[in-house]
Amino acid sequence: MKVMIVRDYDEMSRRAAEIVKEQILKKPDTVLGLATGSTPLGMYKYLIEMHKNGEIDFSNVITFNLDEYIGLSPDHPQSYHYFMYENLFNHINIKKENIHIPNGVAEDLEEECKRYEREIRRIGRIDLQILGIGVNGHIGFNEPDESIETKTHIVTLTEETINANKRFFKSIEEVPRRAITMGLSSIMKARKIMLLASGSNKAKAIKETLKGRLTTKVPSTVLALHPDVTIIIDKRAASLLTDEELANVELID
């Protein structure tokens, strides 16, 4: 596991965008796994800028988003469909048919989970999976006590996650209680994983992730089993790390 500790959110975003850019330059038909929320926003802004400057061509890139709220239509301002188009897809030359996001209003949600998993397998493998991390260590919407064997599935969100996401809604009552998410097994099949974290509120989750102790109580600890993980964190997210924990990882510049 490689760890990069950077100055602040902006530097985290820039360094993450550079890694995505390098991946696409190396493999123009790269399959990206994408995340939503405030953490990757800065990275998306840098990717848009790089595209406008002619540094990246997204025309052959394929994307799979980690998750989507159940009950929110694609045009709902808080749906992850809407988020991705507003903050990335509308500003780059990606083909619509190459964009994949779970359908949170599908008539048969269980079948939608199976369909999404089949589509990932049909394409092959995700080349670079981008992750954020929740305050409780969730990745995607895989909450504590989730089996590491899960594929794309329906999940009931914890109160902790609902409270963390209420800032995006007018009231906590509007926050969806369920979501479709790629499972831990789906995520771990990616060739490479890049996890981003910024801010002191993520420090405890990062500390648990880097302890090297696998526990279902902290879903992100499963990443220790993956052969190619890069974690980019700012100084505040790294603030609780000890020398012992840092000794377990490869620090990179």
Swiss-Prot record:
Its EC number is 3.5.99.6. It catalyses: alpha-D-glucosamine 6-phosphate + H2O = beta-D-fructose 6-phosphate + NH4(+). PANTHER family: GLUCOSAMINE-6-PHOSPHATE ISOMERASE. Catalyzes the reversible isomerization-deamination of glucosamine 6-phosphate (GlcN6P) to form fructose 6-phosphate (Fru6P) and ammonium ion. Pathway: Amino-sugar metabolism; N-acetylneuraminate degradation; D-fructose 6-phosphate from N-acetylneuraminate: step 5/5. The active site is at D67, N136, H138, E143. GO terms for biological process: carbohydrate metabolic process; glucosamine catabolic process; N-acetylglucosamine catabolic process; N-acetylneuraminate catabolic process. It comes from Caldanaerobacter subterraneus subsp. tengcongensis (strain DSM 15242 / JCM 11007 / NBRC 100824 / MB4). InterPro entries: Glc/Gal-6P_isomerase, Glucosamine6P_isomerase, Glucosamine6P_isomerase_CS, NagB/RpiA_transferase-like. This is Glucosamine-6-phosphate deaminase. The keyword Transmembrane helix does not apply. GO terms for molecular function: glucosamine-6-phosphate deaminase activity; identical protein binding. CDD domains: GlcN6P_deaminase (cd01399). Belongs to the glucosamine/galactosamine-6-phosphate isomerase family. NagB subfamily. The keyword Hydrolase applies. GO terms for cellular component: cytoplasm. Keywords: Carbohydrate metabolism, Hydrolase. Gene3D superfamilies: 3.40.50.1360.
